[in-house]
Amino acid sequence: MFTIDFSDHTGLVETSWFDQIDQLLTFAKKKENIHNDAELSVTFVDKDEIQNINKVYRDKDKVTDVISFALEEDEPEIDFNDFDIPRVLGDIIICTDVAKEQSESYGHSFERELGFLALHGFLHLLGYDHMNDNDEKEMFGRQDAILNEFGLTRN
């Protein structure tokens, strides 16, 4: 089972979009060969809240589109596939204000941008990063492949 706990602090995200994000992340989970049960949360916030989270937890006083807090920073200490317990991946926090701005700037739907940001955060929870060119190429390539195969394209 894959459990995603959604919370919308903004009132801007339609509950039907929770289902699409759930389907997208479930699809990504399979593509990333995570076979055991897993849990994560996705929270939608405004600019003030994400800036405060960045300031308090990341020592960066700025607004970002998405933040991920992974509970497993490195390799898990145990192989969760050997046990019948869920793997708690962490938290994804998405700024709806920035998502809306980016969707308009890129010329695609708000719903598509939310899916993109949720997947981006999910891949961070799995250990992907974009701190250097090679890592960025790998992460963004994986991200694009999953979005395209799922059918959530920029068009």
Curated annotation (Swiss-Prot):
Alphabetical keyword list: Cytoplasm, Endonuclease, Hydrolase, Metal-binding, Nuclease, Ribosome biogenesis, rRNA processing, Zinc
This protein's GO CC annotations: cytoplasm
Localization: Cytoplasm
GO molecular function: metalloendopeptidase activity; RNA endonuclease activity; zinc ion binding
Domain of life the protein comes from: Bacteria
Family annotation (Pfam families): YbeY (PF02130)
Cofactor: Zn(2+)
Keyword Glycosyltransferase: no
EC number: 3.1.-.-
Cofactor binding note of this UniProt entry: Binds 1 zinc ion.
InterPro entries: MetalPrtase_cat_dom_sf_prd, YbeY, YbeY_CS
Chain sites annotated for binding Zn(2+): H120, H124, H130
One of the protein's GO biological processes: rRNA processing
Protein function: Single strand-specific metallo-endoribonuclease involved in late-stage 70S ribosome quality control and in maturation of the 3' terminus of the 16S rRNA.
Family: Belongs to the endoribonuclease YbeY family.
NCBIfam families associated with the record: rRNA maturation RNase YbeY
Protein name (Swiss-Prot/TrEMBL): Endoribonuclease YbeY
Organism: Staphylococcus epidermidis (strain ATCC 12228 / FDA PCI 1200)
Gene: ybeY
